[in-house]
Regions:
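Patatin-like phospholipase
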Residues: 1-37, 45-211
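A short, hydrophobic C-terminal helix/tail in secreted or cell-surface proteins
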Residues: 212-216
Length: 216
């Protein structure tokens, strides 16, 4: 029976997930597969590479940098998260991501993204973090404050738009015994999205905000 780890997103709340994953690493816990959504994917990749403390460390160091995540970024680049700092400067040199350890890991890693043209979730397997960094970026590209990410002919946004807790999807992939880390309180029910706002912002992609697509 394959074991899986399912990581909900939640922007800044995701730092809770990072702490739980650090404890898992301290205890030597291993999973056959990890699937993350948005912030869950961002922190989950450091779990797969075995870099305990990395997520919390770089978050604490750069959280107040305007190039990390800020309204300044949004005004000047059209995206609230700084692409260059977060997806290149930090993992490549400032707080290096262990790409080699990720490549050698026997844990399968998936990032959940939303395909704005189909209105459905895409569960994309990442085998080479350096060359597939745009998948990770797409998974965490929050709606309204991020640009669409083009990847292999798909236009992608934050995975939370279509499947914020991809437990059933992971089960269908063969991961039958799962641990799920949530970033909302027990009993939380996600409110329906504002269809009018979504229509104004994503009028070219009606399947992203229609109820039929969301229910599938």
């Amino acid at each position: 029976m394959k074991t899986g780890l399912v990581l909900e997103g939640g922007a800044m709340r995701g730092i809770y997930t990072a702490g739980v994953l650090d404890v898992f690493m301290e205890q030597g816990l291993h999973f056959d597969g990890v699937i993350g959504v948005s912030a869950g994917a961002l922190h989950g990749c450091s779990f797969v590479s075995g870099q305990k403390g990395r997520s919390i460390r770089y978050f604490k160091k750069y959280r107040n940098d305007k190039h990390f995540m800020s309204m300044w970024n949004l005004v000047h680049t059209g995206e609230v998260v700084g692409k260059q700092l977060c997806y290149h400067d930090i993992p490549e040199r400032l707080d290096p991501y262990d790409y080699e350890a990720f490549l050698k890991s026997d844990t399968e890693f998936y990032a959940t993204c939303s395909n704005v043209e189909t209105g459905k979730a895409e569960y994309i397997k990442i085998t080479d973090m350096l060359n597939q960094i745009d998948v990770l970026r797409a998974s965490a590209s929050m709606p309204y404050v991020s640009k669409l990410v083009d990847y292999q002919g798909m236009k992608l946004l934050d995975g939370g738009c279509t499947d914020s807790i991809p437990l059933e999807a992971f089960r269908r992939m063969g991961f039958e015994k799962n641990v799920v880390i949530l970033t909302q309180h027990k009993g939380y029910v996600k409110k329906p999205q504002n269809a009018k706002m979504a229509e104004l912002r994503y009028h070219k992609y009606c399947l992203l905000y229609t109820s039929d697509a969301a229910d599938e």
